[in-house]
Curated annotation (Swiss-Prot):
<dbReference type="GO" id="GO:0006508">
    <property type="term" value="P:proteolysis"/>
</dbReference>
<protein>
    <recommendedName>
        <fullName>Penicillin-insensitive murein endopeptidase</fullName>
        <ecNumber>3.4.24.-</ecNumber>
    </recommendedName>
</protein>
<keyword id="KW-0378">Hydrolase</keyword>
<dbReference type="GO" id="GO:0030288">
    <property type="term" value="C:outer membrane-bounded periplasmic space"/>
</dbReference>
<keyword id="KW-0574">Periplasm</keyword>
<feature type="binding site">
    <location>
        <position position="152"/>
    </location>
    <ligand>
        <name>Zn(2+) 2</name>
    </ligand>
</feature>
<keyword id="KW-0732">Signal</keyword>
<dbReference type="InterPro" id="IPR005073">
    <property type="entry name" value="Peptidase_M74"/>
</dbReference>
<feature type="binding site">
    <location>
        <position position="218"/>
    </location>
    <ligand>
        <name>Zn(2+) 1</name>
    </ligand>
</feature>
<dbReference type="GO" id="GO:0004252">
    <property type="term" value="F:serine-type endopeptidase activity"/>
</dbReference>
<keyword id="KW-0645">Protease</keyword>
<keyword id="KW-0862">Zinc</keyword>
<dbReference type="GO" id="GO:0008237">
    <property type="term" value="F:metallopeptidase activity"/>
</dbReference>
<comment type="function">
    <text>Murein endopeptidase that cleaves the D-alanyl-meso-2,6-diamino-pimelyl amide bond that connects peptidoglycan strands. Likely plays a role in the removal of murein from the sacculus.</text>
</comment>
<keyword id="KW-0479">Metal-binding</keyword>
<dbReference type="InterPro" id="IPR009045">
    <property type="entry name" value="Hedgehog_sig/DD-Pept_Zn-bd_sf"/>
</dbReference>
<feature type="signal peptide">
    <location>
        <begin position="1"/>
        <end position="22"/>
    </location>
</feature>
C-alpha cells in the first residue's frame, strides 16, 4: 500500500467532493485500518461520535487473553488500547485468573455501528466478557449466545450462583491502569464491588453504573496526550461512587419523568466525513 498523504487528501476532498454525511453502513464497509501520513494513530471526535486513523488489530490470542466474536471484525483499536489489553491479559494471568475474553473494540476505521454500540467509535473503548476461560477457535469466531449473565435481572442484584472473586479481581485489575478513565458495569455489579472492596477503594470511582452490562464490562481509555482531535469526557465525580447516586439506579421512575425525547443524531466530525470521501478510499473499503 502506498503512503497516503492524509492532509492533502482531506484538503482535496473538502474542496472538490460532495460533503456527504456518512452513514453507519459506510463505516461497516471499511475492512482495513485507514493509514496515516506519519504512521501515528489519530482518534477523531468523541467516544460516541468519531472515527480513527491508524488503528491496529489486537492479535487473536496473547498472554492471558483471547479475542472473541471475530466474525464481526471489531477487534481494532488505538495502539494505547491494544497495549492496554495485552498488559491486562498479562496481569490477569499473573494473578492466576482464567483466560480473559476480549469482545468488541472498534471497527477498522471506527465510526458508527449499524447495531450494538453507541460508543466504541475511536478505538478507545473495549468490552471484556465476564465469562472467563479459553474458547475453541470456532466459538471464538462466533460467540453469540455464549456469554455469562452474572446479574439476576428480576432481583436487581448479582447472581451469587455464578459471580465469584475472579470477576471482582479482573475488574479491579482493569481499573488500576492509569490510562483508564471509566469502566461501565451493571449497577448491581457496582453494588457488589462496593460491598466487597475492603479498604483498598482507590479504584472504585472509575467503576460507573450503566444500563445492561450484565455479562461484560466496558473499559474506556482517556484520549492520548498527543491526540489533537480527541474529545475526553468530563472527569468522574469525586468519591468511590458507592452512595446515593448508585442506589438511585434501583428506584422506580418518578411519575411524569418517563417520557423520552426523540434522539437527534449529530453530524459526524468533518475529518471523519472527509476520510470516507477520500479519493484513496478504495484502499480500505471492501
Amino acid at each position: 500500500m502506498n503512503k497516503i498523504l492524509l492532509k492533502t487528501t482531506i484538503i482535496f476532498t473538502a474542496l472538490f467532493s460532495l460533503n456527504v454525511v456518512a452513514s453507519p453502513l459506510d463505516w461497516q464497509k471499511v475492512k482495513r485500518p485507514i493509514p496515516s501520513e506519519d504512521g501515528k494513530a489519530s482518534p477523531i471526535g468523541s467516544y460516541t461520535n468519531g472515527c480513527i486513523i491508524g488503528a491496529q488489530a489486537l492479535p487473536p490470542k496473547g498472554e492471558g487473553y483471547q479475542v472473541i466474536r471475530m466474525n464481526r471484525n471489531r477487534y481494532y483499536g488505538h495502539p494505547n488500547m491494544i497495549q492496554y489489553l495485552e498488559r491486562l491479559g498479562q496481569r490477569a494471568k499473573a494473578a492466576g485468573l482464567p483466560t480473559m475474553l476480549v469482545g468488541d473494540i472498534a471497527m477498522p476505521g471506527g465510526g458508527r455501528f449499524l447495531t450494538g454500540h453507541a460508543s466504541h467509535q475511536m478505538g478507545l473503548d473495549a468490552d471484556i466478557w465476564l465469562r472467563m476461560g479459553e474458547m475453541s477457535d470456532a466459538d471464538a469466531l462466533n460467540s453469540d449466545g455464549k456469554g455469562l449473565l452474572v446479574v439476576d435481572r428480576k432481583a436487581q442484584r448479582v447472581d451469587e450462583r455464578v459471580w465469584n472473586s475472579n470477576h471482582a479481581t479482573l475488574i479491579k485489575l482493569a481499573a488500576q491502569d492509569p490510562n483508564v478513565t471509566r469502566i461501565f458495569v451493571n449497577p448491581a455489579i457496582k453494588v457488589k464491588l462496593c460491598q466487597t472492596a475492603g479498604n483498598d477503594r482507590g479504584w472504585l470511582h472509575k467503576i460507573r453504573p450503566w444500563h445492561g452490562h450484565n455479562s461484560h464490562f466496558h473499559v474506556r481509555l482517556t484520549c492520548p496526550a498527543d491526540a489533537s482531535y480527541c474529545e475526553n469526557q468530563a472527569p468522574v465525580p469525586a468519591g468511590d461512587g458507592c452512595g446515593d447516586e448508585l442506589y438511585s439506579w434501583f428506584e422506580p421512575p418518578k411519575p411524569g419523568t418517563s417520557v423520552s425525547k426523540p434522539k437527534v443524531t449529530p453530524p459526524e466530525p468533518f475529518l471523519c466525513q472527509q476520510i470516507l470521501n477520500s479519493p484513496n478510499r478504495r484502499e480500505w473499503l471492501e
